[in-house]
């Protein structure tokens, strides 16, 4: 009887735990640009120093995603964490599968990120460009 009780607890708690993980990971990617860094909040979030940016561009497509290295990929297009794109590990912070995507390259990492709408993504890109002062 004891083992049936434990199995029932597992069967009940597993969907609840999975639901919590999906809820937490599917929250909107909050991204802010401060004076000297870009902050991506949430699960697999990161801080990117503006001074470390070597390349910055707005891309319509991203390379093919070969596999998840350390991250989460949800059915609604959200992707967060490290992914293998072509032959390199890249950090993705994607709200959806539609471009444009902001591409950022530093000495240590490469990133692709986008926001819920084209307008918000372009606005974030403009903010980063302004902070970086690519003149």
For every predicted segment, state its role.
Residues 1-30:
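Alpha-helical transmembrane spans
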Residues 9, 16, 31, 82, ...:
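A generic structural signal for ordered alpha-helices
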Residues 20-51, 55-57:
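Conserved beta-hairpin
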């Amino acid at each position: 009887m004891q083992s049936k009780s434990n199995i029932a607890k597992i069967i009940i708690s597993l969907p609840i735990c999975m639901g919590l993980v999906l809820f937490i990971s599917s929250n909107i990617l909050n991204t802010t640009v401060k004076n000297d860094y870009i902050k991506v909040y949430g699960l697999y979030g990161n801080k990117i120093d503006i001074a470390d940016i070597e390349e910055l561009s707005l891309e319509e497509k991203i390379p093919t995603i070969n596999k998840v290295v350390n991250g989460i990929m949800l059915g609604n297009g959200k992707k967060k964490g490290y992914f293998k794109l072509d032959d390199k590990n890249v950090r993705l912070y994607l709200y959806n599968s539609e471009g444009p995507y902001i591409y950022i390259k530093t000495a240590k990492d490469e990133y692709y990120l986008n926001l819920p709408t084209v307008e918000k993504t372009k606005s974030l890109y403009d903010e980063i460009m302004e902070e970086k002062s690519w003149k």
